[in-house]
Amino acid sequence: MSGHSKWATTKHKKAAIDAKRAKAFAKYIKGIEVAARMGGADTSGNPALELAVSKAKKNSVPNDNIDRAIKRGAGLTGETIDYTEILYEARGPQGTALYIECLTDNKNRAASEVRVAVTRHGGTMADSGSVAYLFERKGVVEVAKTDGLTEDDVLMAVLDAGADEVLDESDVFEVVSEATDLPAIRAALDEAGLEYNNDDPQFRATMTVDLDAEGARKFLKLADAVEELDDVQNVYSNANIPADVMAQLEDDE
């Protein structure tokens, strides 16, 4: 799940921990399978696979699962896995836009499930290009907030590596850069000894839409329903849930 931090913060509080963990595991496993299919099972000769495995390990995916994913992706088990990346566009309540990133081995299934989830929860599918222009591809790295670490500390570590900005987002600092600068950002953080996660290219909204309480409730139900689909890797949005509205949502629980 990806979007404005106010959405992310609320979403984390509302989501079931076990469900999030299972979804995250599936995402990392798919990433490993795709990288192994493209470049083979040897991490030393396949940088994309090495990175995918590193991310999975950082997020506590068991080694057995990782090994099986590498073998499946590389075709060493006799299985054939052919994933396709697809982007769907949708509209939500109060002018919100959703950019839905899927990785699937069945395009018809993915399209059908996304359409059903969107329409059943008050959204509408959008024509190609009618939502995409609201987003830009960025590199985003989440740096863990350790004792004493400040926003300025992170900025100083990554400034010369091409970082556009560092954002203070509740329990992490977000380093935002051009997607092509991600390797340099990772290297700079490693050199500074700073722990980081979720170092991926993401679609970021160029402008956000503020939601009131009713709109936020509808939006979260819609985003949750789409994000829970097996083929969905990420849901990006221009939705912003202001602090006072977020407080109302927390009172609902």
Swiss-Prot record:
Q: Which GO terms describe its cellular component?
A: cytosol
Q: Name one Pfam family in it.
A: Transcrip_reg
The alphabetized list of GO BP terms reads:
regulation of DNA-templated transcription
The keyword Transcription belongs to this UniProt entry's keyword annotation? yes
Coiled-coil features, chain-numbered ranges = none
Keywords of the record: Cytoplasm, DNA-binding, Transcription, Transcription regulation
Q: Does the keyword Transcription apply?
A: yes
- InterPro entries, alphabetically? Integrase-like_N, TACO1_YebC-like_2nd/3rd_dom, TACO1_YebC_N, Transcrip_reg_TACO1-like, Transcrip_reg_TACO1-like_dom3, YebC-like
- Location of the protein in the cell: Cytoplasm
**What does the record give under GO molecular function?**
DNA binding
**TM segment ranges:** none
Among SUPFAM superfamilies, the record links this protein to: YebC-like
Family membership, please give it: Belongs to the TACO1 family.
Q: What is this protein called?
A: Probable transcriptional regulatory protein KRH_13670
Q: Which organism is it from?
A: Kocuria rhizophila (strain ATCC 9341 / DSM 348 / NBRC 103217 / DC2201)
